[in-house]
Regions:
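Acidic, surface-exposed loops and disordered segments
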Residues: 1-325
Length: 325
């Protein structure tokens, strides 16, 4: 039986999978697998690749896969394909995160427009310029999150702002040895999960930085990093969902990638300050300290970058074809 005219050919399938693989993930773990076919793409979780020592490990896998899922949608929209998205479509297969089925021609123009920033987006752990992100841009980022069923809440008032900064510092100091050892193994592997040029400099602990920048390698002497003072008052926001569970984590991941691509288009970079979200008790404190009423999924540090790091390396993608429906 011949495929319809809107079916994906093999080069298109390969391009979509490659784009999806560029999505952000915890420690660049890329905990996903993609199955492609003429009729669409499936996103599968691959928890074997994810850090396992934190309380947030399972949530992080679904968040990362959600970011990849939005990138699949943007890539297919760029190819002018309309799609139907089913999240967690098989009750008996929790690792099947989403099935994206091509239904015809006519891609989502907003998602297609965001695709142009897929290759430019970076997780930026370097210092940002001190000027704040304009309120109008933050409103656009909030709208991007809401489009995917999440809420981006800016931390712009005291004492909530300082409380969350304090929680970030507390979580960094209280990290379990197993967490640090797992991360060190990943950072010193061949190849490293996050190369030195993507780690950013060691934060200068002289009171000049705002404490939101996460040093991923505090116990490692890695040549070439250097030290730097970071912005004294980092722009912080919390990405939240009304519910908490795999479907909400996938939604948060889609919202994250959508707002990050929107931010990239406005010259804004981001890194993540999720330290307190990796501990169940501190995660609850983030929610209450920020005077929020949803479930915090990500803490973002945003700003205008002084340095644009290279793209973090991606592992080769094996994307077997799945049978036609």
């Amino acid at each position: 039986m011949p495929y319809p005219d809107h079916a994906l050919d093999v080069p298109e399938q390969t391009a979509v999978a490659a784009a999806a693989a560029s999505a952000p993930s915890v420690l660049n773990s890329q905990p996903w697998l993609f199955s492609t076919g003429p009729q669409g793409v499936e996103v599968h979780a691959d928890p074997r690749r994810a850090p396992t020592a934190t309380a947030s490990a399972r949530r992080d896998v679904y968040l990362s896969c959600g970011a990849a899922l939005f990138t699949v949608r943007a890539a297919l929209a760029r190819l002018d394909r309309a799609v139907r998205v089913s999240v967690l479509p098989e009750a008996g297969d929790p690792l099947l995160v989403a099935r994206v089925t091509v239904t015809g021609d006519g891609g989502d123009p907003e998602a297609a427009a965001l695709y142009r920033w897929v290759g430019d987006r970076r997780t930026n752990r370097h210092p940002f310029r001190p000027e704040p992100v304009p309120a109008g841009v933050l409103a656009l980022l909030g709208g991007a999150a809401e489009h995917e069923g999440a809420t981006l809440r800016r931390l712009d008032a005291e004492p909530e702002y300082q409380r969350v900064l304090t929680l970030i510092r507390r979580a960094s100091l209280a990290e379990d040895d197993a967490v640090r050892e797992d991360r060190a193994d990943r950072l010193t592997g061949v190849p490293p999960a996050v190369p030195v040029e993507n780690l950013g400099p060691v934060p200068r602990r002289d009171g000049t930085d705002g404490g939101a920048v996460r040093d991923l390698a505090p116990d490692l002497a890695l040549p070439g990093r250097g030290t730097a003072a970071f912005e004294p008052h980092p722009e912080l926001a919390v990405l939240e969902t009304a519910e908490d569970g795999p479907a909400s984590w996938v939604a948060a991941g889609q919202a994250l990638q959508r707002l990050l691509l929107e931010a990239t288009g406005h010259g804004i970079a981001a890194s993540f300050a999720n330290q307190p979200l990796e501990d169940a008790e501190l995660r609850e404190e983030v929610s209450s300290s920020a005077a929020h009423f949803g479930h915090p999924q990500m803490v973002l540090r945003m700003g205008y970058p002084l340095t644009r790091p290279p793209a973090a390396p991606r592992r080769p993608q094996h994307h077997p074809h799945y049978p036609a429906a």
